[in-house]
């Protein structure tokens, strides 16, 4: 399918999901991560442990405290909220192309002063050049019509020496192409890890409620 059609299809899917599922307990849209190491969490975050652990795995090697941070593809905001309160960035701005998801997240997390949610296009980020310390992206880029444009937008927006933390699902051929895009754009890959086993282990533990909710909301 064409990049435009692919992007439009994913946008429709996520918009429909956000509209149909305004439940406050359905705040994460990622698969989860389980590596046998128990991340220390507040009691209030325990129900979302596996989803939070994927976010933590993605950003745990960088220092976010006092930094200008961006999440691209934040969904319903659960991950951004947890990172903002746990790692204390100066400001975390979270973008998503679903205005309904952004509306939910903005309402749910309005009390977090270092966190904001905005509608935004990953392939045309509303950010100034060289303005952010860290940009991260969790299981979202497979929806984009042109991933190379997205990577270039991230590179443009990062300060010199900034970090891009990325995780998503890809087959062997497409991940090799993506690595080439990173390098061609100007990034240095300082660490990488395949986490298929850890994600599958998390999926085995995730309650069927999440899958049921998606199936009820999206035909």
Name each region found by the language model.
Residues 1-26:
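N-terminal auxiliary segments of SAM/dcSAM-dependent transferases
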Residues 123-135:
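A short acidic, Gly/Pro-enriched loop at the edge of an enzyme's catalytic core
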Residues 176-219:
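Substrate-binding/catalytic lobe of Class I Rossmann-like enzymes that use SAM or dcSAM, i.e.
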Residues 70-72, 76-124:
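Class I SAM-dependent methyltransferase SAM/SAH-binding core
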């Amino acid at each position: 399918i064409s990049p435009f059609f692919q992007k439009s299809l994913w946008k429709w899917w996520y918009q429909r999901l956000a509209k149909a599922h305004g439940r406050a307990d359905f705040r994460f849209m990622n698969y989860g991560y389980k590596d046998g190491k128990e991340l220390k969490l507040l009691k209030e975050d325990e129900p979302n442990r596996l989803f939070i652990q994927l976010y933590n795995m993605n950003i745990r090697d960088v220092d976010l405290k006092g930094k200008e941070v961006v999440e691209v593809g934040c969904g319903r905001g659960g991950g951004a909220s947890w990172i903002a309160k746990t790692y204390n960035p100066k400001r975390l701005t979270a973008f998503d192309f679903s205005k309904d998801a952004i509306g939910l997240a903005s309402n749910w997390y309005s009390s977090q002063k270092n966190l904001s949610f905005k509608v935004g296009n990953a392939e045309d980020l509303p950010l100034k050049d060289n303005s952010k310390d860290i940009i991260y992206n969790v299981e979202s880029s497979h929806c984009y019509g042109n991933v190379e444009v997205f990577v270039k937008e991230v590179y443009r927006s990062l300060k010199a020496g900034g970090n891009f933390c990325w995780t998503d699902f890809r087959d062997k051929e497409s991940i090799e192409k993506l690595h080439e895009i990173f390098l061609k754009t100007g990034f240095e890959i300082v660490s990488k890890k395949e986490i298929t086993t850890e994600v599958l282990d998390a999926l085995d533990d995730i309650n069927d409620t999440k899958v049921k909710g998606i199936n009820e909301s999206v035909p």
